[in-house]
């Protein structure tokens, strides 16, 4: 299976594909890996969705979705059918790292979309969409805004806001596990395990460009709370997740 993964990725690199062809190739690779290595059937369920809401101009609104997913998925947002936050990119890198044996790749992902100062142009139908390469689920709500248009403070010079993160993650010991943490803008990233800053020089931890944390060969001692910190010169935002390493069953 590892050779298949490498061959597919090499072919993609050697022969640039259109975005549609690329998505199809990655999707096929995901299904191929998961069909062989997942310990349970793929599943995807929204456990906290959206509700219609009416707010006054100038109010802050936060929309949130929580999703239980096997394998790990991603969440993106749409307004009136147009994507406004996030993407459909799945974590193929972790799958390739774990392609030599069984994987659990299960947990809860949470995502939020923030309207810091509601105005009339924010009226519309909002949708959170979750996908894991096998299924797609969504939750939608209508946001109504009442009142006269107000002048809102610019958010350009603001601290980053965490927009998607892993709330909990289950994975077999000795496998790699990725803890998701994404922000609404470019940010500097730090990660902590319990009360200690993670040492990226140790070789087991890798900070991915997206802000995610990759942990190689997780052990029982890695169980606990992890905190991601996205920061810039204007401030910071934090997310928290819990990692559950599980024992491999020896036949």
UniProtKB/Swiss-Prot annotation:
Expressed in PVT, AIM and ASI neurons, in vulva and weakly in body wall muscles. Its main location: secreted. Required for maintaining axon position of PVQ and PVP neurons postembryonically in the ventral nerve cord (VNC) by preventing axons drifting into the opposite side of the VNC that could occur during body growth and movement. Disulfide bonds join 65-128, 181-228. One of its GO terms (molecular function) is cell-cell adhesion mediator activity. The keyword Nucleotide-binding does not apply. InterPro entries: Ig-like_dom, Ig-like_dom_sf, Ig-like_fold, Ig_sub, Ig_sub2. Residues 1-19 form the signal peptide. SUPFAM superfamilies: Immunoglobulin. One of its GO terms (biological process) is dendrite self-avoidance. It comes from Caenorhabditis elegans. This is Zwei Ig domain protein zig-3. Disruption phenotype: At the L1 larval stage, display defects in the positioning of the ventral nerve cord (VNC) axons characterized by axons of PVQ and PVP neurons, but not of RMEV, HSN and AVK neurons, drifting into the opposite VNC side (axon flip-over). These defects are not enhanced in a zig-4 (gk34) mutant background or in zig-4 (gk34) dig-1 (ky188), zig-4 (gk34) sax-7 (nj48) or zig-4 (gk34) egl-15 (n484) mutant background. In a zig-1, zig-2, zig-4 or zig-5 or zig-8 mutant background, cell body positioning of ASI and ASH head neurons is normal. GO terms for cellular component: axon; extracellular region; plasma membrane. It comes from the Eukaryota. PROSITE patterns: IG_LIKE (PS50835). Keywords: Disulfide bond, Immunoglobulin domain, Repeat, Secreted, Signal. CDD domains: Ig. Residues 42-144, 160-244 form the Ig-like C2-type domain. The keyword Kinase does not apply. It is found in: Secreted.
